[in-house]
Every structure is written in structure tokens, then in C-alpha cells.
């Protein structure tokens, strides 16, 4: 393991332990505390590359978590794992669930657009311009929303929207 990654893992584990201690003394009910601890364990496992363990912890967190913003964050992390594992359809469905819990997650929209844009490029390579346009239009739709939520945060996407002519001028800074 590279030295910098080892240091990052140490810091993440130290932060996780510290967060667990803080959560134990916070004046919130035990269900919320337990949901947060499962979430943190899922995040630590995800950072360590243990995706199956991370998904198990995230599932447990979702069973306990009532806060929609927190549920949206957990679902987003699950979708990232599915996307990393190449399960694009499950990733898209999970991103949509995450946005249903918290529609103000530009990274979900960005990642959905990445999947749509990839599919469009594949259709283009296969000579299917109509299918390519459908996928690119879907990418433009979600990316335009992401740029509106996070102006200046996705310059590469803003550039893609401009150069393909699929974005509205009002989305840019």
C-alpha cells in the first residue's frame, strides 16, 4: 500500500473512532446515533475498498435513518459503489432514489450524466446517431440541473454543454 494511502486510511480510521465517541454523547435518540454509526462504518469500508461490507452498513443505516438528507447521502454512496462495480442500471436507479430523498445533490446528477454520456459515445462509435442523440440529450438534461445547483463546480460539464450546443446560456457563470 502506498505510504500516502496508508496515512489516509489511518486518518480516516482515527476520525471514525473520534466521531463514534462524539456521537455517543450527543443529545440525539439512539436510533439516529446507530444510523449514523452504520453510515460511518460504511464510509470507512468504502474508503478501504471493501464495497460489499460498505453496502451492508449502508443498508443497515437506511433501515434506521429517517432524515431525508442523510438517506439521500447514503443512497448516493451506494450508487457510487454500483457505478464503480459497473452496474450502471442499478447505479442510475439508486441515484434517482437519492434525488427523491434530497433533490439538491449535484453529484448524483453529474454521475447520472456520466453514464448517459458514456452510453451516447458507445452508440456514436456503433454508428447509431439517433441513439447517441437520445443519450446525449439525457446527459444534457441532468448536467444542466447539476450546473445550476453547483455553478462553477463542473467546468468540464459546462464546457461540454456549450460545445455540444445542448445547454442553455443561463446555466453558466
From Swiss-Prot:
Q: Does the keyword Membrane apply?
A: yes
Superkingdom, taxonomy of origin:
Bacteria
Location comes to: Cellular thylakoid membrane
Pfam families from the UniProt entry: TPR_12
InterPro entries per UniProt = PSI_Ycf3_assembly, TPR-like_helical_dom_sf, TPR_rpt, Ycf3/AcsC/BcsC/TPR_MFPF
Could you list this entry's UniProt keywords, alphabetically sorted: Membrane, Photosynthesis, Repeat, Thylakoid, TPR repeat
Stated membrane topology is: Peripheral membrane protein
Is Transport there in the keyword field?
Answer: no
- Spans of the TPR repeats are 35-68, 72-105, 120-153
Q: Which GO terms describe its biological process?
A: photosynthesis
- What does UniProt give as GO cellular component? plasma membrane-derived thylakoid membrane
Q: Identify its protein family.
A: Belongs to the Ycf3 family.
- What is its biological role? Essential for the assembly of the photosystem I (PSI) complex. May act as a chaperone-like factor to guide the assembly of the PSI subunits.
HAMAP family with a match to the protein in the record: Ycf3
User: What is the protein name stated in its UniProt record?
Assistant: Photosystem I assembly protein Ycf3
